[in-house]
Structure formats: C-alpha cells, structure tokens
Amino acid sequence: MDRFTPRLSALSTALLTVAFAACGGGDAPDAESPDTSDAPSSSAMTIGAGEPFAADAREGHLVNLRQLTFEGENAEAYFSNDGTRLVYQRTPAEGGCDQIFTFDLATGEQQLVSTGTGRTTCSYFYPEGERVIFASTHAESEMCPAPPDMSQGYVWAVYPSYDLWIADDDGGNLTQLTDTPGYDAEATLSPQGDRMIFTSTRDGDLDLYTMALDGSDVRRITDRVGYDGGAFYSPDGSKIVWRAHYPEEGPEMDDYLRLLGQGLIRPSSLEVYVADADGSNVQQVTDNGAANFGPFFHPSGEKIIFSSNMDDPTGRNFDLYLINVDGTGLERITYTDDFDGFPMFSPDGRYLVWGSNRNPSHDGNTNVFIAEWVENPASAAGM
C-alpha cells in the first residue's frame, strides 16, 4: 500500500473537481469496417462547436483539435450513435452538483437531461439517440450528497443513493431503472443495444453486472473482492474492458472492507482488465502500479486507449495511452503537463473526445476536447 501513497495524493489533486466514476463507455465503432486510415478522411459530421486549439507537436495522432467547453467542470463526454452529439456531466461555474447535458457538435447547443437536483454521473445514449441513461441521487434528496470524509485520506464516495434512470434527451419521461439497496451507477450499453453493463453494491461488493435494457435479466459477472468499475463493450460486443482495484489480503483488504461499509473506497492503484462479455476469460492488460482508468476500445477492437499517471514520478500528470489488448505495444498519445482522461472514439472511429485541464479558465478547470484521429502519424506526415 505504501508504494501507492504518492500517486494517491496526486490523484486527489488532479481529479478532485471531476466525478471519477469514469464510466468510459459509449456506442462503439463499427467492428466490420473501422476507419483506420493514416490521415483523417471527410465525414458527414461537421464540428462547428467550440474553438480551435493547438495540439502539442508530439501529439501526432490528434489533428484539428477543438475545445468544446470553457467554464465549470466538464467530463465524461460520450458520443451518440450517429456521432453528432455528446452526452456529458457538468458542474456549473457557480457551483452545485454534477448534472447531465447533451451537446450538439454542430452548434454547441446544450440541453439539460437530468433533474437539476441531487448528484448525477455516468450518462450514456440509448442506441436510437433519443434517450439517455444516467445515475442520480435525486430520489433520496434534492440536495447534493455530503462530500466524502477526507480525514481518512483521499477516498471516493460510492453513494448508496445512486440509482439508474432513463430520460428522453430533453429530460422528459424520466423513469427509474434500478431501485435496489446500495450503489448502482457506471452504466454503458452494448453496441448491439441489447444489454447494458454497470457497477453495483447490491450483493455487498463493487461488482460488474449486466442486464437487459428494460432492467430485467440481471446477471453478476465479477466476484473477486475489490472495486470493478467503468466497464464498456468492444466494437463487436464480444468483450468488455474495465478498471479494477483488488486489495491484497491483510491490512489493505481490511481497509477496503471498512471503507466500503461507509460507502467509500480508497483508489490506490487501478489496473485495466479485459474479459468476454459474460465475465469469463479475464485478462489483466496493465500491471504498472499506477492509476490507470477510463479505458475504451480502439475501433479495431485490438487496442485500448486509457488514462494513466505512469510516466510522472509525482503521479500528478495524467495522459492518454494506447495499448494492445494483450498488454504489449504501449504508446503515449498526449503530452501536456495537465490532466487528460475519459477518452472515447466516435462511432466511425474518426474522432477522439476526452476531458483535459489544458487551457483552463481557472486552476484545475476540466473541459471537453475533440480531435480528428490519425492512425499512423508518420505515414500521414509523409503524404
């Protein structure tokens, strides 16, 4: 546990203003014909929202970078199936709790989806793009839930008042999907739109579950003691990827169970895992002792993009990385001295959206950025 202490302190600094549920989901790209060309190709989608922003010269995979948000705290932005909109969580500049909004990439128009009360997290479009799923605490109280007790060190709150809700993309027809004791959040949908995956404490630990889109046929697919979260499906729906922390027996396990009983977890290290969609054939992808989170499949289904502080000895700087599903071929994607996280590819594989502290309006300000994705920067440069 001691070897993770510097990273924990850094994690609290970098992410204190961002709800770190890190759903890491989204409607996946077409598995049969992913766009992996050397240079960005023309697309029917026109991004008129936001303002151009210069990428670091070392960020060769990213071109035509645009900053989409500018005030408040903005993160966990995920594409609609047609790639024209995002759904994300935002804390207004004037304060309050995170709420869920949609964002039109052509115009920048935003629409509140959640109730404006309680705290929300982890939003995701239904396949047809007219409904959104998210987690919210508003049924228990319209007030923001109490922040976690930091006297115990840096901890995350897994509020038992979080349940899954569905609403139209304009906030209408709000429907509660789960109503079980404990935390239900971090839901994403399969590319086929037939099942969803989420994290729940309904059986006493933070495990992954799948269920039909109407809330029926719930299946628990992980059972190892520890935190399993932020899962999503591969492009063909056959695999899942998630981040997890499995405490070792002894004091670390005792601390985990004690905090869990208080609705808290201590995010020491987080590693990335993959498995079949039913939870079988689990394989560990990263093994570096750092905080690795927000994994999302590359359009090919053969690589994973994720955020990590592995290259900063102080643990303060998080960047995006690409890695093969077997753990080989690690490549760094972003190079800023600030936080970069929550990456997601667009359904056609041509764009990457993520959250970043670059160009902040105030210290630690997190905003949403989008860029065209270049699969092979060296080849594109020679064109």
Task: Tell where the protein language model's regions lie, with residue ranges.
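Hydrophobic beta-strand positions that form the internal "hydrophobic ladder"
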Residues: 86-87, 132, 196, 240, ...
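Multi-bladed beta-propeller domains
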Residues: 53-73, 103-119, 167-183, 213-227, ...
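Blade/loop signatures of beta-propeller domains
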Residues: 41-63, 162
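Bacterial signal peptide processing site
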Residues: 24-26
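Residue-level detector of Asp-centered blade-edge/turn motifs that repeat once per structural unit
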Residues: 81-82, 127-128, 191-192, 235-236, ...
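Blade-level signature of beta-propeller repeat domains, shared across WD40, Kelch, NHL, RCC1
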Residues: 344-383
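C-terminal motif of bacterial Sec signal peptides marking the signal peptidase cleavage site
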Residues: 20-22
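A flexible loop/linker signature enriched in serine peptidases of the S9 family
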Residues: 70-72, 90-100, 115-120, 135-163, ...
